[in-house]
Structure formats: structure tokens, C-alpha cells
Amino acid sequence: MKRSISIFITCLLITLLTMGGMLASPASAAGTKTPVAKNGQLSIKGTQLVNRDGKAVQLKGISSHGLQWYGEYVNKDSLKWLRDDWGITVFRAAMYTADGGIIDNPSVKNKMKEAVEAAKELGIYVIIDWHILNDGNPNQNKEKAKEFFKEMSSLYGNTPNVIYEIANEPNGDVNWKRDIKPYAEEVISVIRKNDPDNIIIVGTGTWSQDVNDAADDQLKDANVMDALHFYAGTHGQFLRDKANYALSKGAPIFVTEWGTSDASGNGGVFLDQSREWLKYLDSKTISWVNWNLSDKQESSSALKPGASKTGGWRLSDLSASGTFVRENILGTKDSTKDIPETPAKDKPTQENGISVQYRAGDGSMNSNQIRPQLQIKNNGNTTVDLKDVTARYWYNAKNKGQNVDCDYAQLGCGNVTYKFVTLHKPKQGADTYLELGFKNGTLAPGASTGNIQLRLHNDDWSNYAQSGDYSFFKSNTFKTTKKITLYDQGKLIWGTEPN
């Protein structure tokens, strides 16, 4: 009998060990309270999110990608795994309005309801996210928003785990006082008729970065918070300064979206910068939600391509971002290492290496061609291999097909390469960049590439509005500029990328 027991125990241990990457479930032990059972109804006290006992609470979790694209990852099984294995206390369901979202595909709302019902059963908080993005002004679909939030608040107004996010990322020619605040007042009024208590989060200008503007003209509702969004590879101390200003004005902040990547969603990951951000959020007890739960082949995704859609993920199923985020939600010491990439924009660039000079071949504000002329100069003491160097000219293509011609290059037009890149998330003054490179050649210390004259045009030859383009300025002589950025093997070495 003892021998049989010994054999059984040995087999059991072998079985457990061979499960290898299967992860422990810290929240699944019998008797563990769910986040909602533990904290109950949330409210605002000063700038702080607090639970039913008035104690500060910091929610941590993850956001879906667009429900219309990656909705299969949003289900009770996956959310249960995230609660039990990752330790999430909040899940954000990102329901796009445009881009195949609810405006054109009303059935997406059913996936939102599925997410809320699953969160209710699992006892986690859930953010109902009206995910405006390419439709940058929330007023564009205001009546649809009011209709949607009327329905959601009537269904879930007595459910303490529901949080409403009524405008994901206002952007473009939008400001707080004229556009966002009046919109928010109308939508909040609709929600409050059915739900007097639950938290409402309002997006801020410039893709939810301008919390300072919202802080200067605050909404009157006692349980409203302002959304702050950041991507660790793009946004640094300048954005934390905005957050500090908002807090000093008594405006509560909820980070409903942040990524370990750059703002495109697909550069990085930037783990050192992410650690700096999370340390800051912890110091202020600011709640956060990471972007995103999907297997999309980009660096901000938490899962590797082909990962299960219902949870049960091994460590080997998680991306570098997913591994980092899971460990930081759990509060364990992360063991991940940075993947070398472009550094954060607020890091100092190399001043004594190569630089770029620019002049406008066509200074017209409205023209059917953009004609940048530039030359790259080696200010350092060592020879530069040009095949490792690329330059980016940042501008607005407005979703039109792009073409480029080389009119003249001292190094030879045949030695110059080009690539157009559309940004995942438009930046201030740019939704596209033209990347210029070289097939071969070197730059000795003190040498220059000489003049490179380019000409861009739309497929339909329609006009550009250059005045709003990040890299453009009107000059008929060459001037040094940091708004055309330079890279050595993909690493930023000169200039400042747009916000």
C-alpha cells in the first residue's frame, strides 16, 4: 500500500512538472474575494478612485483590441483566465465607432454585452469603451452615443462593476472647451438618468493627452474622471508633467489605455520606459489598462499569433509585452529584458553625430506636390555607413495613395530608396512618413550627402495642405531641422518625432 501511494505521488509530481509553462492561478483559491466583492461601488474622493469604504483603489487590467476585429478573445473563459492567472481587476471592451465598428455594424454591441455579462459573473470591473479614433470629433456620432449609453445605463445602472468611457481619443481639430466638454455634458446627462453612481471617464484632446485642458475647465459631475493615454516608446516626462498639473488642479485621472510600444502600436517594446511609467502611476495610485488583448502581429499585443482565444495561455504563448504586463499586474518582479528599438522621444538625441538640413522646393501652402529638399551632414569624428542610415519626413497623406520621385541627388537617385509608412495612430501634424534610405556609400567626418530633391504626389493628384505637416516649413535656404528624423539601423539618432 505504501509503495502504491509512493508511486502515485511520484506520478503526480511528474505530471505537474511536465505541465511546464502552465501558470499558477493566484486568484483562484477557494474563498478568495473577487475584485467587485472586495471593493464594491467605486466613487471619487479628491483625485482618487476609492472603494465603498472610502479607501484608495488602483485597478489594473487589459483592454481588448477592436471588438469587430478581435472579439473572439473577449469571452467568459478568457476573462476568467485573466482574472485568475493575471490578477486583473478591470477589463476594457473597446468598441470602435468607425472602421467597421458600431456605426456601420450594430451587431458589435452584442459582443460588448457579452463582455459586461461575463465581467458581472466573474466579479471584475468592466469599462464600456465608446472607441472613437478616426472619427476624431466625438460630436460626429453624438446622437448614436447618447442612444447607446442610454441603453447600457438602463441595463447596467444598478451594477457596481460597470465603468463608462464615453470618448476614447478625441483628436484632430478638436478642443476641450468647444467640442469635448459640451459632448460629455450631454452624454453624462443621459447616463445619469439611469445610473446615478458609476464612474464615467471622458477622453481628452490630442488622443487623450490634454488632461491639463480638462483640469482647467472641469465637469461638474462628482464621479467623472479624465482619460490619459500613453505609449511608453513615444510619451515620456512631458506627458507626466501634464498629469501632475491636472492632479494639482484636483482633476482625477484614469489611464484607460497605455502600451509598451510606441504610439503606432508596433514599435518597441520599451520596457524601461514602461517601468518608469508604472512606477509613476503606482506612486499616484492611478488605475491603468494596457493595450491590448489580441494575437495581432504587433508589439503591443499581449499574445503571440495563434494563441488560444479562451485563455489557458502558457508563458510561451505571451508576447514580450504580455509577459511584462502580466507580471506587473501580479506585482511580481519582472524578469523581462528590453528589446532594442527606437528610444523614447524625450531622450536627448546625439548632437555631435549626423544631422539633417532642409529647404522647401515648393513653399506653397496648398499644392498638388510636396517637394522636400534635404542633405545629411556628418558632424562627428568617424565615417558613417549610409546603408545603415534612414531619414523620415513626417506629413499628412489623409489615407490617399502616395508616390515619390527623385528629381536630383548628388549621390545619384538610383542610390536612394523610399518607403511610405502609414501610422497606426496619427500624430500631431502627421499620419504618414516617407522613409528615405541609401543602397550604399559613406559619409566621411565633415562630409555631406549633398542636395537630395524629392517630389511627392497623391494618386489622384489632389492638393496637400502643407501648413499642417510636421516636417514642413517655408524656407528657400537650407536650415538645420529636428523635425526630419534620422535613424541608424532603426535607432533614433537625430531629431524629435511628432507627438
UniProtKB/Swiss-Prot annotation:
Pfam families in UniProt: CBM_3, Cellulase
Keyword Signal applies: yes
GO molecular function: cellulase activity; cellulose binding
Catalytic activity: Endohydrolysis of (1->4)-beta-D-glucosidic linkages in cellulose, lichenin and cereal beta-D-glucans
Keywords, sorted A to Z: Carbohydrate metabolism, Cellulose degradation, Glycosidase, Hydrolase, Polysaccharide degradation, Signal
Signal sequence region: 1-29
GO biological process, one term: cellulose catabolic process
Binding site for substrate: 65, 69-70, 96, 131, 231, 263-264, 291, 296-298
Active site, UniProt feature: 169 (proton donor), 257 (nucleophile)
All copies of domain CBM3, residue ranges: 350-499
Principal EC category: hydrolase
InterPro entries linked to this entry: CBM2/CBM3_carb-bd_dom_sf, CBM3, CBM3_sf, Glyco_hydro_5, Glyco_hydro_5_CS, Glycoside_hydrolase_SF
EC number: 3.2.1.4
Family: Belongs to the glycosyl hydrolase 5 (cellulase A) family.
Name of the protein in its database record: Endoglucanase
Gene: bglC
